[in-house]
Each structure stands twice: as C-alpha cells, then as structure tokens.
C-alpha cells in the first residue's frame, strides 16, 4: 500500500543522480540543492518543504535540503541538465520533460492507460514502475518516486 504522502501532487519527483557530488559541505552539514519549476504555493512545493524539514530533523542537522522553487535555477530541462553534470542534487520534473531523457516514459501520454487510480498506483509500485524509474539512469538521472498528477 502506498502512503498518502507519496500520492501528493504533480508529475515525477526525479533524479537523485549525483546527489553527493551536488552536495556542499557546511561544517558538518551536507547540503543537497533541490530545484523545481513550481510556485511556492503549490502543494508539491509544500510537500518538498515538509520532506526537507524531516530530513534535517531525522539527520540531526547533518543533512539539509535547500529548495529553489519557481525556476530559480532554470527550466525543467535545464534542471535535468544540471543534475547530469552534478551541479544540482535533486529536482522534480514532469514526465513530458523527462521523456526526452527516457523515452520509455512516453507511455504516460497514452489515454486510458490505467483503469482507475488504484490500478495506476499498483502498476507504479510494481516491477514495471521500478523499471520506469530506472529508465533514465543511462542518462545520469535516477527516479525516486511517482507523484499523482490529478
């Protein structure tokens, strides 16, 4: 069963590629930069803020996620390219942008692909979903999870 927090918001949270090469160290604290294109009022941004707060709390301050919303670091495509070169640690992008790096993700553009919401989550939590998350690894990107787009 998928937790409610994993079902939040839009698109795919992607690309934990090169996390530690995109970290900077401030004293004992490692910092991961997370960029995205959404406004700070968007539910996904709020979920990312929640995640960042929990990461810092659970790591006793040894790991911090700095969030750069509203395309501060670039468009979705530019964010993916920053991941590839190690200048960014994490991003959240839509499958429409990501399918340029992993054509397998074009499957999400098919109408009526899933019977209902539960079927969608059952598929995405299966080996099929894992394979889709891994499909961008050849381009130095690593998918973490799927998010609900509505």
What does each of the following model-derived ranges do?
Residues 1-31:
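Short, low-complexity disordered leader/linker segments with a strong preference
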Residues 23-36, 56-64, 137:
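Immediate post-signal peptide segment of exported/extracytoplasmic ligand-binding proteins
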Residues 33-49, 70-74:
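Extracytoplasmic "Venus flytrap"
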Residues 41-66, 126:
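Short, polar/charged alpha-helical segment
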Residues 44-51, 75-79, 120, 128, ...:
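Stable alpha-helical elements in mature extracytoplasmic
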Residues 53, 84, 94-150:
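Contiguous mixed-secondary-structure segments that line small-molecule binding/active-site clefts
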Residues 61-63, 79-93:
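Alpha-to-beta junction loops
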Residues 65-74, 145:
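Short beta-strand-to-loop elements that line the ligand-binding cleft
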């Amino acid at each position: 069963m998928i937790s409610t927090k994993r079902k939040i918001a839009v698109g795919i949270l992607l690309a934990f590629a090169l996390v530690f090469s995109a970290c900077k160290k401030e004293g004992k604290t490692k910092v991961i930069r997370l960029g995205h294109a959404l406004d700070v009022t968007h539910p996904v941004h709020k979920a990312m803020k929640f995640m960042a707060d929990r990461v810092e709390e659970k790591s006793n301050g040894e790991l911090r996620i700095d969030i750069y919303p509203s395309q501060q670091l670039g468009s979705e495509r530019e964010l993916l390219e920053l991941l590839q070169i190690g200048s960014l640690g994490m991003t959240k992008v839509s499958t429409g942008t990501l399918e340029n790096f992993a054509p397998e993700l074009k499957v999400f553009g098919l109408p009526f692909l899933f019977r209902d919401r539960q079927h969608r989550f059952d598929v995405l939590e299966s080996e099929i979903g894992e394979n889709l998350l891994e499909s961008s690894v050849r381009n130095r990107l690593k998918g973490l999870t799927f998010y609900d787009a509505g």
